[in-house]
From Swiss-Prot:
GO BP terms, alphabetized: regulation of transcription by RNA polymerase II
Any Pfam family matching the protein: Homeodomain
Residue spans of biased composition, Basic and acidic residues class: 174-185
UniProt KW keywords: Developmental protein, DNA-binding, Homeobox, Nucleus, Transcription, Transcription regulation
Provenance organism: Strongylocentrotus purpuratus
Family: Belongs to the paired homeobox family. Bicoid subfamily.
Protein's UniProt name: Aristaless homeobox protein
Length: 327
């Protein structure tokens, strides 16, 4: 509530006029204006008078009030003009808002610039390494791995176990094409299996960069007979049949597989040249030959014919006994 002053009206007007010069926007005393303590020394009592923060001095006497009014008038006259309280408050608020907005913009810009600098520094750290040394290193590693993978398997390298497992996964057509291309030059000689190594290549085949170790196997008559019997039954025995036959003839499964590969290649070459012996329907007749062949081929063909006749007798297709063995 407003307090009613007993001072004259001129004193009230003078006190209100002095108010803006004695208080700042935060209701703090301005150092350039005499503080309330100095007014008390002069015989004044300062109290709150209205809602605008104005102070109204209540005097004990007219002489003290007159002195204060005179001081206030002198100060206002020296300042040059009367100041509006509301206009000054609005200007200060706008200034504060502008300062606050500029501070926020500055902080946002600083943070964005800092993030951009960090990103550029991080890119600058790893990208030259990746584009330069790392790319060359990765390329060298790839070349090393490719050359290592190329040395894992070569057609002329001895692979007894790995070759047996890969052969079972190949189709019959792929085996025929591979074997025909691999063994077509190996039968220009007399065609004996003893002159072939494990992979059906002669010693004087293509020259290689490194010296290769070749293994040759000499088959006995019993082994050849059993192998020819199995070949007459099927040209492509599975891995179980090969293992059983290898145990029976005292050979390794890989060697039996290589023998079947060589035998199939020999069979195809004879059919291509028209030299393959054709079995006569009657068992007592010998093979009808389409041309001259060697003694070893004749023995193999006769053994194959005997195996076919024996199988026919077991199945009950023939009633007459088989002919005596070939001497």
């Amino acid at each position: 509530m407003k307090r009613k002053f007993e001072a004259p009206q001129i004193a009230m007007d003078s006190a209100v006029c002095c108010t803006p010069r004695t208080m700042d926007a935060d209701n703090r005393w301005n150092a350039s204006v005499p503080s309330p303590e100095r007014h008390r020394e002069a015989g004044m009592v300062v109290r709150e008078s209205n809602a605008f923060g104005a102070v109204a001095p209540a005097t004990r006497g007219l002489a003290g009030m007159t002195g204060s009014v005179g001081k206030c008038n002198d100060m206002m006259m020296n300042s040059g003009s009367w100041v509006d309280v509301s206009r000054m408050t609005d200007a200060r608020v706008k200034d504060n808002e502008q300062v606050f907005t500029s501070l926020i913009k500055t902080q946002v810009l600083d943070s964005s610039v800092e993030k951009k600098d960090k990103t550029e520094r991080s890119i600058h750290i790893w990208r030259p390494a990746l584009d330069g040394d790392e790319k060359e290193t990765s390329k060298k590693d790839v070349d090393v791995e490719v050359s290592r993978a190329a040395r894992i398997w070569r057609p002329n390298d001895p692979q007894p176990e790995a070759h047996s497992t890969t052969a079972t996964t190949m189709t019959m057509g792929d085996q025929e094409r591979n074997e025909s291309s691999r063994y077509v030059d190996d039968f220009d000689s007399d065609g004996d299996d003893e002159h072939l190594d494990e992979h059906g290549s002669n010693a004087g085949d293509r020259p290689t960069k490194r010296k290769q170790r070749r293994y040759r196997t000499t088959f006995t008559s019993y082994q050849l007979e059993e192998l020819e019997r199995a070949f007459c039954k099927t040209h492509y025995p599975d891995v179980f049949t090969r293992e059983e036959l290898a145990m029976r003839v005292d050979l390794t499964e890989a060697r039996v597989q290589v023998w079947f590969q060589n035998r199939r290649a020999k069979w195809r070459k004879r059919e291509k040249l028209g030299l393959q012996p054709r079995l006569h329907p009657h068992p007592h007749f010998g093979p009808i030959l389409g041309g001259p062949i060697s003694d070893s081929n004749l023995v193999s063909s006769h053994l194959c014919r005997l195996a076919c006749i024996d199988r026919a007798h077991r199945q009950g297709l023939l009633t007459s006994p088989p002919p005596p063995p070939f001497v």
